[in-house]
Curated annotation (Swiss-Prot):
Residues binding NADP(+): 143-145, 279-285, 302-303, 420-421
Organism expressing this protein natively: Aspergillus clavatus (strain ATCC 1007 / CBS 513.65 / DSM 816 / NCTC 3887 / NRRL 1 / QM 1276 / 107)
Known pathway: Mycotoxin biosynthesis
Lineage, opening ranks: Eukaryota, Fungi, Dikarya, Ascomycota, Pezizomycotina
UniProt: FAD binding residues: 125, 133-136, 145, 151, 195, 534
Entry keywords, A to Z: FAD, Flavoprotein, Monooxygenase, NADP, Oxidoreductase
GO molecular function: monooxygenase activity
GN (gene name): ccsB
Keyword NADP in record: yes
Protein name: Ketocytochalasin monooxygenase
InterPro entries: FAD-binding_Monooxygenases (IPR050775), FAD/NAD-bd_sf (IPR036188)
Reaction(s) catalysed (UniProt annotation): ketocytochalasin + NADPH + O2 + H(+) = iso-precytochalasin + NADP(+) + H2O; iso-precytochalasin + NADPH + O2 + H(+) = cytochalasin Z16 + NADP(+) + H2O
Family: Belongs to the FAD-binding monooxygenase family.
Manner of cofactor binding, per the entry note: Binds 1 FAD per subunit.
Length: 636
């Protein structure tokens, strides 16, 4: 369209030149219009040099090993359930499907199975309640950072509309329990139960599953929905075991120590000095609550987060409920995912607030408004300029909010927007204006060590009564399955899950089916279609699992399924597409869990998400199921 228009304009200029003023002709024959982003005055080299300098100062030789899993010996108490689960008698039972995990992925799989007519299943989870991440993360201020209307599962089916755009933990768990009640899932669940081993028995084509209570389940299918944000990760700093004050991980908040609840009101901190190590997504939500209630708060920072504001207003629930057509939630999820991947959708999707500036949709709209046609070869430059602009705005916002210039400078993020998990909070930056709050920036080095009573950073001791580790979860993609789950998983050829994947990284079909582990259905990000809304991924994978299991049980012809080696290899190759570009970007970022603490080259390309996104993954898997011949599967 753009080239056709230019031909028309050039022809018109030649024809009408005698009767058009020279000033107008100069506009027609002058420089071509440029995208508004290309008019911005950025010193690209200086910005990228600053990014690299900030990255370099944070790099460590020990990489991910600088952190300690809470499963390791001395740190085990940091992962224990505050609910103090009780002992019970062992259970011996057979079932068609055993679901490992009662978080969103496990619950969605259970509901999808139920909807497909498969009701002989059991759910097992180490937590004392449902919700997975949202069971463990009950710290003050915990809230979702994806719009509630697409994040909370089964809103349409339960008839519930969230109270606000980004709802808080208690409301999320209320919806979880609403789902549990509607589909009678509690009756089929075993909570406060940790699976210790799973072994395939080829003689009966079933899994033997054992737990810490001495349970023994025999099951045909296993849905492995163990999740990612549940096993606390601690900084590997000397002295943790010797600290005499109170200390816990943010994912195991202990209100017996702080008082209050998830809204705050931590009255028992009124005369205490509190330290928090970490400034990631959880800390950003926590700090304003601690700032309000603690006598003194030290915030120990390695790398600042990018902070954005959001409208978190209340919904007009009755009118919103009336306006939503059938199928609205799944459609809204689809629109959200499509826009993020640059696809054209029929309507605007305000669920993208805070993310829309870097989408192709936004860049093309800005071009259209300026009368500019974007050529494919311009897209990388425009995306980078959009990122520069956004990060400049984020840093400018820090200057506007934080009164102390030295503190403001230390809170500014110097990296590309998606290098670290984006965070959103309207009160985090302002908390540093409180006289009782002190930022302890470690210039990328982290805390040095703990004494019996203090945190040592930058050569200075900071005495604290309570220390909170807001240092994330054991999300390292290279961490072995046993370390992350505590499950000794042994397949049909006598090899463990870790021995299989240690060869060359994940080998799967669709990210779900795994050779040597028959009837094991894996729910995880590797080789699966994902989007910024994890709930959407659980829906897509849940549909695939439920329809696959239901068809297998209805047909009854085969008892066990596992992908062929050729099918795994082909799917692995498809997942490696674009890995070079992903690696280059990750190598430009400061250390974090996105890039294996600054060593992304150690991550096999096969650990990547399916590169074409959740919508294409859904289409591929749906077509595979509709063919009905289990293509790429060994069957017996």
């Amino acid at each position: 369209m753009g080239s056709l228009l230019s031909i028309v304009l050039r022809s018109a200029t030649r024809i009408i030149r005698p009767i058009i003023p020279s000033s107008v002709l100069s506009l027609l024959s002058g420089p071509k219009p440029v995208h508004p982003l290309q008019t911005l005055q950025f010193d690209k080299e200086a910005i990228l040099e600053k990014y690299q300098a900030e990255r370099a100062k944070r790099l460590r030789q020990d990489g991910v090993s600088q952190f300690k899993s809470a499963r390791s010996g001395a740190y085990d108490r940091f992962r224990q359930d505050v609910a103090r689960p009780q002992s019970r008698e062992p259970i011996e039972a057979e079932t068609k499907v055993l679901i490992v995990g009662a978080g969103f992925a496990g619950l969605v799989a259970a509901v999808k199975l139920d909807q497909q007519g498969v009701q002989d299943f059991r759910i097992v989870d180490k937590a004392a309640g449902f919700g997975g991440t949202w069971y463990w993360n009950q710290y003050p201020g915990a809230a979702c950072d994806v719009e509630s209307l697409i994040y909370l599962p089964f809103l349409e089916e339960t008839g519930y509309i969230p109270s606000r755009r980004f709802c808080y933990g208690p409301e999320i768990r209320e919806q979880v329990n609403r789902v549990v009640a509607k589909w009678d899932l509690a009756r089929r669940s075993h909570l406060s139960t940790e699976i210790t081993s799973m072994t395939w028995d080829e003689s009966i084509l079933r899994w033997h599953v054992k737990t810490n209570h001495g349970d023994h389940f025999i099951t045909q299918f296993v849905v492995m929905a163990t999740g990612t944000f549940h096993e606390p990760k601690l900084p590997g700093i000397p002295g943790i075991e010797n600290f005499k004050g109170d200390h816990f991980h943010s994912g195991r908040w202990d209100y017996r120590i702080t008082g209050g609840d998830e809204t705050g009101n931590m009255s028992q901190l009124a005369n205490k000095t509190v330290g928090i190590i970490g400034t990631g997504a959880s800390a950003v939500q926590l700090v304003p609550k601690l700032a309000r209630d603690a006598k003194k708060l030290y915030v120990f920072q390695r790398t600042p987060s990018s902070i954005r504001f959001r409208d978190n207003s209340l919904y007009d629930t009755p009118s919103l409920k009336k306006s939503l057509p059938p199928g609205w939630q799944r459609q809204r999820m689809t629109d959200f995912a499509n826009i993020l991947t640059g696809q054209v959708v029929d309507q605007d999707c305000d669920a993208l607030e805070g993310l829309q500036e870097l989408t192709m949709r936004a860049i093309l709209k800005e071009a259209s408004d300026a009368g500019v046609t974007v050529q494919p070869e311009q897209i990388p430059e425009l995306m980078q300029l959009a990122d520069f602009r956004l990060m400049q705005q984020i840093r400018g916002q820090v200057d506007e909010i934080v009164k102390d210039q030295e503190t403001a400078a230390k809170l500014k993020p110097w990296y590309s927007f998606m290098c670290k998990r984006p965070t959103f909070h309207n009160d985090y930056l302002a908390a540093f204006n409180n006289p009782n709050v002190e930022l302890v920036d470690t210039d990328g080095q982290g805390v040095s060590y703990l004494t019996e009573t203090a945190v040592v950073a930058n050569g200075r001791e900071y005495e604290v009564d309570l220390l909170v580790y807001s240092t994330g979860f054991d999300f390292d993609v290279e961490a072995n399955f046993y370390r992350r789950t505590g499950i000794q998983l042994v397949g049909s050829r006598g090899r463990t899950f870790d021995e299989k994947w240690d060869e060359k990284g994940p080998s799967t079909l669709f990210g779900v089916h795994i050779r040597e582990f028959p009837n094991l259905l894996y729910v995880g990000p590797a080789q699966t279609g994902v989007t910024a809304n994890w709930t959407h991924t659980t829906y897509a994978v849940g549909d695939h699992i439920a329809e696959f299991v239901a068809k297998s049980l209805r047909d009854g012809q085969y008892q066990a399924f596992e992908p062929t080696e050729e099918a795994e290899e082909e799917w692995g190759r498809r997942n490696e597409e674009g890995s070079e570009m992903r690696l280059l970007f990750a190598q430009s970022c400061p250390p974090g869990y996105y890039n294996r603490e600054g060593k992304p080259e150690e991550i096999p390309a096969r650990w990547a998400y399916f590169p074409k996104g959740i919508i294409e993954w859904t289409r591929i898997t749906q077509e595979w199921r509709e063919k009905g011949d289990y293509q790429g599967m060994d069957k017996r």
